[in-house]
Amino acid sequence: MHSKVEFFNNIAELWDGWEDRDALGCVMKAGLQKMEISSHEIILDVGCGTGNLTQALLGRLGPGAKVAAIDISPRMVEVAKTKVRDGRVSWQVADACQTPFSSNYFDRIFCFSVWPHFDDPKATALELRRVLRPLGRLHIWHHIGRDKVNEIHATASPAVSQDILLPAQDLAALLLEWGFDVLEAEETENHYLISAQKPEKTGEC
């Protein structure tokens, strides 16, 4: 088994106990309020983990909206499915660099607390760009600062010890190279957010 999949499978049942879920929910709610999410959007939650972001998103979405939530860890997906029961959500075990979705499908994609874990960030970015509709948005978001993210990964397990989050401006520059328009790139000691957009005209067939 892929060591990273095994790592996340092993911690799936422990994940929600490591953080105050009420406090996390408040942080997510405040962040989502700033993102001008329409009630009818079709959204992809990449690296959904135990479903915390999906759960927060559902509170902002209407009955016609859809959330596709994917993760490489089958156990994480099982925990999420048990915790978040809503007909607007589809749960799948899938790799972010090779998703099962049609091109130009999603209005918005979230990578919440997951980006450093992608083994091939360029391939992942290109795949997410493919499934985004023109002018659709990608959010790379962490609710803690970059230094803390990297410190946690360095000491957690050899499976994730090299999973480094780049400075926001450096990752934003890469997203530009990979065909996105960057709308914002900000980081503080307690926050990290890059919002990017797929251009209206991409030259793709």
List where the protein language model places each region.
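A short SAM/SAH-binding and catalytic strip from SAM-dependent methyltransferases
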Residues: 108-120
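A short acidic, Gly/Pro-enriched loop at the edge of an enzyme's catalytic core
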Residues: 97-108
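A short glycine-rich, Lys/Arg-flanked "PGG" loop and its adjoining helix->strand segment in the class I
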Residues: 122-134
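Short alpha-helix
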Residues: 163-178
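Core SAM-dependent methyltransferase catalytic element
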Residues: 178-179, 186-205
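Class I SAM-dependent methyltransferase SAM/SAH-binding core
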Residues: 44-46, 50-98
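Conserved class I S-adenosyl-L-methionine
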Residues: 1-36, 52-56, 76-79, 137-162, ...
